[in-house]
């Protein structure tokens, strides 16, 4: 088998594993998994084995054939007789993964790239001495920076002294004329320096370019006779000389403070438990919310979950009761958001990543969505708000809550609205929810 075949086989195995994960989420037994271990059923593959050729059994001896004695145990019940169907389940095993691996597998399956951000600072450590300040102990002085700044200033202020001195030998030129000419030539020389040189001229420089008693009739003649020596050439020939160091250029090194932030998350799961939420709807909620819990547990360092049930009132429940509880009252979704807002006061948004997931069949009391729920969703700071409408295909869709929320928030990057009508919709709903979150706030 070549490299190409190996690669294709690898992709086939990976794709089959992702399909197994999707089938488990949509149709598998979620109750067999716990908060710290997800048990995904996998199909067993028969290992290669030698078998007798069914067409080469050999012959029999002479005479009548008598039936032989049965060897081994008789067939177990459940395998079926003749054309009857058996009642044994297919061979399978479970692959147990932790939430981190589950999150990675789901990311790969859905093509997600959620990178949660830490918020709460739990520790500070000193890193390398890469930061600088204007003040500090003399022992931490960054002399290289100080010298470099001085050298830059030296180069910026440098000029060819012999060239300027030569301008003083132009016929009829004095200090003012030379200074005006130097300014026009962008030569960084002061009038005081020119005046001092005029009082005590230097007949030549190290290069011997200016000769004694040389006088030019015009500045053009001087410029034609004397070449300007570049600063780089002078420094290479005689060194930089005295470099001016100034206190304003002093910088002192200190270690960079590295903040270690803990990635904390609190997830508020809200479910309508009113009389209209029959078992088929509750199952769709469980198949959507449970993988989200596993996913966020795997993504964050510390995950806490709050479960709120509501009809016309709202109350906190344990996770074990959350998906099975049912009441006979009406529906007022805002009561759940009011309770969620109070609960989240204990989880400051500056320190916690916050998710608020709600689910129901879309039914709500008159005007409660517009007057109460939508304002509350605006007031509750969260990485992501999501509403999952569960409407099995065998029922009449009468709820309007999801549509009103969708209209109110539009394409807002922290509000997701999705509808689940059957298990096949669950993976799409999860993808819609997780891909809606703006990764900058995660």
Swiss-Prot record:
Organism: Halobacterium salinarum (strain ATCC 700922 / JCM 11081 / NRC-1) (Halobacterium halobium)
UniProt feature, compositional bias: Acidic residues: 72-88
Protein name (record): UPF0229 protein VNG_0746C
Coiled coil regions, renumbered to chain: none
Region Disordered, annotated ranges: 55-91
InterPro entries, alphabetized: UPF0229 (IPR006698), vWFA_dom_sf (IPR036465)
Family the entry assigns: Belongs to the UPF0229 family.
């Amino acid at each position: 088998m070549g490299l190409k075949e190996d690669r294709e086989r690898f992709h086939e195995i990976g794709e089959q594993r992702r399909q197994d994960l999707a089938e488990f989420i949509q149709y598998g037994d979620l109750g067999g998994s716990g908060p710290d271990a997800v048990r995904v059923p996998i199909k067993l593959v028969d290992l290669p084995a030698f078998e007798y050729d069914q067409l080469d059994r050999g012959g029999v001896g002479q005479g009548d054939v008598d039936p032989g004695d049965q060897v081994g145990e008789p067939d177990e019940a459940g395998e079926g007789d003749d054309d009857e169907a058996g009642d044994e389940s297919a061979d399978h095993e479970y692959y147990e993964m932790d939430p981190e691996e589950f999150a990675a597998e789901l990311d790969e399956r859905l093509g997600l790239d959620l990178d949660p951000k830490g918020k709460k600072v739990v520790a500070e450590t000193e890193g390398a001495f890469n930061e600088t300040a204007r003040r500090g102990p003399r022992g931490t002085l960054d002399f290289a920076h100080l010298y470099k700044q001085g050298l830059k200033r030296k180069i910026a202020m440098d000029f060819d002294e012999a060239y300027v001195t030569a301008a003083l030998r132009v016929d009829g030129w004095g200090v003012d004329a030379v200074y005006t000419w130097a300014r026009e030539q962008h030569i960084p020389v002061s009038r005081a320096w020119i005046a001092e040189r005029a009082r005590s001229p230097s007949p030549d420089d190290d290069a011997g370019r200016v000769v004694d008693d040389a006088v030019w009739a015009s500045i053009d003649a001087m410029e034609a006779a004397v070449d300007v020596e570049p600063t780089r050439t002078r420094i290479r020939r005689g060194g930089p000389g005295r470099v001016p160091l100034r206190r304003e250029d002093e910088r002192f090194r200190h270690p960079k403070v590295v903040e270690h932030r803990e990635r904390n998350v609190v997830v508020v799961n809200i479910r309508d438990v009113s009389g209209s939420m029959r078992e088929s709807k509750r199952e769709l909620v469980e198949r959507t919310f449970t993988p989200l819990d596993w996913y966020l547990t795997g993504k964050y360092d510390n995950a806490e979950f709050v479960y709120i049930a509501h009809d016309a009132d709202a109350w906190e429940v344990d996770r074990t009761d959350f998906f099975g509880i049912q009441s006979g009252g009406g529906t007022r979704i805002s009561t759940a958001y009011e309770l969620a807002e109070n609960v989240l006061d204990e989880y400051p948004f500056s320190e916690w990543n916050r998710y608020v997931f709600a689910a129901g069949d879309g039914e709500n009391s008159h005007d409660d969505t517009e007057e109460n729920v939508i304002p509350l969703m605006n007031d509750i700071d969260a990485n992501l708000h999501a509403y999952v409408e569960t409407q099995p295909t065998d029922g009449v869709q009468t709820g309007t809550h999801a549509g009103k929320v969708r209209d109110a928030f539009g394409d807002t990057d922290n509000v997701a609205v999705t509808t689940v009508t059957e298990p096949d919709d669950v993976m799409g709903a999860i993808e819609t929810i997780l891909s809606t979150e703006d990764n900058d706030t995660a």
